[in-house]
Swiss-Prot record:
Keyword tags: Cytoplasm, Magnesium, Metal-binding, Nucleotidyltransferase, RNA-binding, Transferase
Catalytic activity: RNA(n+1) + phosphate = RNA(n) + a ribonucleoside 5'-diphosphate
Organism classification: Bacteria, Pseudomonadati, Pseudomonadota, Gammaproteobacteria, Candidatus Pseudothioglobaceae
Protein name: Polyribonucleotide nucleotidyltransferase
Species of provenance: Ruthia magnifica subsp. Calyptogena magnifica
Subunit description: Component of the RNA degradosome, which is a multiprotein complex involved in RNA processing and mRNA degradation.
Cofactor(s) the protein needs: Mg(2+)
Enzyme Commission number: 2.7.7.8
Amino acid sequence: MGINTKSFVMGKHTITLETGRIARQAHGAVLVSMDDTQVLVTVVGSKKMHPGQDFFPLSVDYIEKTYAAGKIPGGFLKREARPSEKETLTSRLIDRPIRPLFPNGFMNEVQVLITVISANSEVDPDIISMLGVSAALSISGIPFNGPIGSARVGYSNGKYTLNPTYTELVDSDLDMVVAGTDKAILMVESEASELSEKIILDAIIYAHEQYQVAITNIAEFVTQVGVQKWDWEAPATNEVLLSNIKSQFGKQINEAYKIKEKLNRHVKVGEIKTAAIEALVNEDKNGNSIDEVSKYFNKVEKSTVRERILNNDPRIDGRDNETVRELKIETGVLENTHGSALFTRGETQALVVTTLGSKREAQLIEKLESSERQNDYFLLHYNFPPYCVGEIGRVGTTKRREIGHGRLVRRGIAACLPSIEEFPYTVRVVSEITESNGSSSMASICGASLSLMDAGVPIKAPVAGIAMGLVKEGDRFTILTDILGDEDHLGDMDFKVAGTSRGINALQMDIKIQGITREIMEIALKQAKEARLNILGQMNQVICEPNTSNKNTPKTAVIKIQTDKIRDLIGKGGETIKGIISTSSASVDVDDNGNVNIFSNDQKSFDTAMQMVKDVTTTPKIGKVYTGKVVKIVDFGAFINIKPNQDGLLHISEIAHERVDKVENHLKEGDEIDVKVLSLDRGRIKLSRKVLLEK
């Protein structure tokens, strides 16, 4: 195969696809570029399915090479190691729109690798990475119902921006990524600043319209390359087995899905499944294997639940389609934390804890596009331990899902946080999912808002989140508010919306089918807003403004000193500032502009540090009396240390009212005496003792 290239314009950027020059032994390989950013995408698939395979083993890994930006990796080994959070999030972003486009029944292993090999400091590689994956899969021959397109949308001054640069995003009220086919939107990921439902929906439609040029050109690129499709056919449906399961076990499955408690329901469904396997598996006579019976049992299970929803029957837990599960909201549940909340929605529960730290405890972030490390003063960590779903599992390693859900929660909260200037703390929020039956990330957003207010963080407005679902068959569809885990698994859409009473902060949408219309999205957004306002109303009954009387809240302040006093505060070899920290047990930092940050968990410690900093950095006041120590005696007087690093001269004539012939007759080094400041002359301090003595 020779070298093939295809270039096209998308917005203000030129995108180029190339294949046949690099990575020629991969089943599909595309070098995609936009401006100076270049990404190599490779796809390799297995021609055979592993025996007994019952899921689609697709792996997607996005990798940023530091050489792409002219950097050498930090650390001892000086090579790229474990994936960064950005790499993990982008891997998930790419996986989500392509996974639904592999045909049902295709379970051959597929590996997609995306490697950033040249990086422009203004272009996020994620959009062209998705376009490159779309092209590489389409020319690989692997069964894939693409191509897809993708676009980023910004919004500022009432206008949308297509594929904005990093600089343009700084002033944007929206950062949205949308991906889909020529006819369907498959994935949306967005962060916003309290925008209306209409602005968000119009942005999704705008992106879908704009990436059509990419889909058209990728299709032309595929034709240009010439692709030989794999000889693969979807396995035929065993209609007899499917019919037998429906007739023998359909009613039992239907009754089992009326059990409201998740664990009890799963136990009952498991018992019915075991009975079906015992009744229908007979590999010697009819060839029905355990795996085959399990597969068709799952199909009947899915169709049973979906049909009930479409018929507007009561949902699994007895609710109608627009009702939010019962809420239980508590704050201040942990005695010694800075802020805490326990948010329970049905069988989903999040224990969310806020910790306030000093600015020096910020997370240092190294970005490919930036030459300098950046401080992140807001940390949000989401933990999903196995016990929350009644399972045994490995602990210790942060999973991709936890990173992805944590980022979604962060997006929901970030727009309402005060700036570091308004609130000079590093803020860490941890969400521990203690129970899960759907929508744990949205419970985390509600819990985070409550926990932050309990800690006294002056957030701009309370934030709540809700997960919506969809079941669609032909022209029939039903939108569900506050979906359960089973409704998420058996449905066609996962649509998460978070925001305040004023607007949307975050939206995440994953759609498993084609044919989602603007009407469906409008209804989903309308129901989500109603549910969000309902939840916010109940949250506000518990806590509606920051708790300013929290005894556990650390104390912090920033004081400004003259830049020529920085040296005095630090002292020789850091001696002075280290002494303040050691004596007060507080954290003290000073920057080059003279901003001194003092932080302590204890009021007494904070006050001590504050006074010591002021003693070192403030100029003595004329007429004020100080208690000082004699540090040196000379013929013409004595030098008295009245403040840290500040000595004044007590002239021999100012020691006593009577004539002093010899200083040593009145003072000796180490004596503590009271003195009054007479004058300040170009940094020289003149003192008097005799004015404080009676004649």
